[in-house]
Amino acid sequence: MLAVFMGLCAMLWPPTGDLYRHTMDYFAFRELSVREFSYYMEVRGESRFDFLLPLLCFLFAKAGIPFEFVRFLFIFITYMLTFRVFEDCIRKNPGIARMSAAVFFIFYFSVQFFTIVLGLRFGFAVILLAYGAWQYLEERKSVGLLYIALSCMVHFSVIPVAMLLFLARFGVRINNFWISLLCVGAFLFLNPNVLMRVIDILPVSDGEKIVMSGYVSGYWSGEFLEDHSLKFQIAKYLSFLMMFPLLYFAFRNKSDRPLCSFVRLLIPVVFICYAVSVTMFFRIGLLFVPIGAFLFFSGSTVNSPFRIRLLLICACLSFASQVYAFRREAAISHEYMLFYPATVGFSSTFSEQWINRHVYDDGALRHK
């Protein structure tokens, strides 16, 4: 029921940021034929990898299903998968059963609800990848491969991380010396120019290279934070507060389990992303928080109550920081309909007229 409730919250959130673009695409898809949609995908360059969201929007548009139900579906699945891992962790590690309520809220608050709702693609992709890693590496179930494949179809940028996952599955390990060396090297030698050269040789379309370049050396590499207040910038970093203790716990974890190997391979990636691009750092954080939590709570030994309380505090502060960062969007949202009968909320939609009245073409709010 909680997953349904969060899905309803997603339906009532205003379409700003990337969500604005996806919503306007949905409206445009209502007028397209199958052939026109195929041509649109070829022009956009999204037909090779991350075609799942546009395809889903097209199908919903042609079926007359409001776009808000796409959001509901993504958020509902996100929380259902997260809660399934919580149940698996309680089963695998009875030592934390006595603190199951605290652990549950850690899992609940660790989900970056607002980031996933506003962007849809990447946030949902990393949840699918994290759950796929859990099933494939920890549970040794081949169904994990399906979730990994779906994650790549939602957002192509998770493909390099998926490659690390397979390296861990086939026995690649990294010790603390190499982790430390790579992290220090990232700060000393890595810069956007190096990444730009790497992007140039990647086997992806020119359009995808332009998008990736924007995250490395353009506006989204960090300049976007300058458009916001210092309080917003602090709130943005605090929303990933839970990642820092999880990084330390993973660094200290020397288990030979494939899941542990995968998480430890991600540690230098986090530092590399931070050295190159703030946006890349936030994005890898979206993956590291859930997968790091999965590793921590699946351990065979009894986890320290202090560590669990620490993670709970970090998770609560992270969620509160998200609420603060997106308080302006909340002010014009339809979240007040949560106090109405559920049928009212599920029938609520954001029309093109409402969007044009409240949101600029770049996805920013008209009234701040």
Where would I find each of the regions flagged by the language model?
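Alpha-helical transmembrane segments and terminal signal-anchor/GPI-anchor hydrophobic tails
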Residues: 14-15, 20-36, 162-283, 327-356
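Short hydrophobic/aromatic helix or loop-helix immediately within or flanking a transmembrane segment
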Residues: 20, 24-28, 40-65
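Transmembrane-helix motifs of polytopic, lipid-linked glycan transferases
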Residues: 73-92
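Transmembrane-helix signature of polytopic, membrane-embedded enzymes
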Residues: 86-108
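Membrane-water interface signatures at transmembrane helix termini and the short loops
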Residues: 103, 114-129, 154, 246-303
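Membrane-interface alpha helices of multi-pass inner-membrane proteins
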Residues: 112, 143-167, 272
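Membrane-interface transmembrane helices that cradle and orient dolichyl/undecaprenyl
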Residues: 129-143
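Signature aromatic-anchored transmembrane alpha helix within multi-pass, membrane-resident enzymes
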Residues: 303-323
